[in-house]
Structure formats: structure tokens, C-alpha cells
Swiss-Prot record:
Cross-referenced Gene3D superfamilies: 2.30.30.30
UniProt region (Disordered), positions on chain: 52-78
Pfam family membership, one: ribosomal_L24
Gene Ontology terms for molecular function: rRNA binding; structural constituent of ribosome
Family from the record: Belongs to the universal ribosomal protein uL24 family.
Keywords, in A-Z order: Ribonucleoprotein, Ribosomal protein, RNA-binding, rRNA-binding
Name of this chain's protein: Large ribosomal subunit protein uL24
Function: One of two assembly initiator proteins, it binds directly to the 5'-end of the 23S rRNA, where it nucleates assembly of the 50S subunit.
This protein's GO CC annotations: ribonucleoprotein complex; ribosome
GO BP field: translation
PROSITE patterns: RIBOSOMAL_L24
Gene: rplX
């Protein structure tokens, strides 16, 4: 996907047009240009396990947004 120009960028509001979160809207947190994916706030949330560390001595779980293919989002005007 090198040298491909995308119509969305970080901070844009987009609507999910395909997949489990179809119809939801959110702000783009990151664009993964090499993979052709975006991370949208509040969409495709997965629970990830965290290993114990100095920051989190007990470890645990955290909800994290996962990447969505850029073809599955549409920019919302406004």
C-alpha cells in the first residue's frame, strides 16, 4: 500500500460502513498507512491482557481499539 493517498487523516470523524460496528461514528486516532488501516475511537474494542509490571503490579485487562480496514470507513462531512 505504499505511495497511496488516503482521503482520511488523524482527527477526522468517520462512519463505519461495514463489519460488526456498522453504523457507528467515531474520530480517527491513528492511520496505519503501510497496512491500509485506521484506528477509530470506540469501534472494534477488544479486551487485551496486560502482564504485571512496575506500572501495573497486578496486571489485568484493558479495553483497546483495534485497527479497521480503511475501505470500511467513510468520512463524515460537517
Amino acid at each position: 500500500m505504499a505511495n497511496v493517498k488516503f482521503k482520511v487523516k488523524k482527527g477526522d470523524t468517520v462512519k463505519i460502513i461495514a463489519g460488526d460496528d456498522k453504523g457507528k461514528t467515531g474520530k480517527i486516532l491513528a492511520v496505519l498507512a503501510k497496512k491500509g488501516q485506521v484506528i477509530v475511537e470506540g469501534c472494534k474494542v477488544a479486551k487485551k491482557a496486560i502482564k504485571p509490571s512496575e506500572k501495573t503490579p497486578n496486571g489485568g485487562h484493558v479495553n483497546k481499539e483495534m485497527p479497521i480496514d480503511i475501505s470500511n470507513v467513510a468520512k463524515v462531512e460537517g
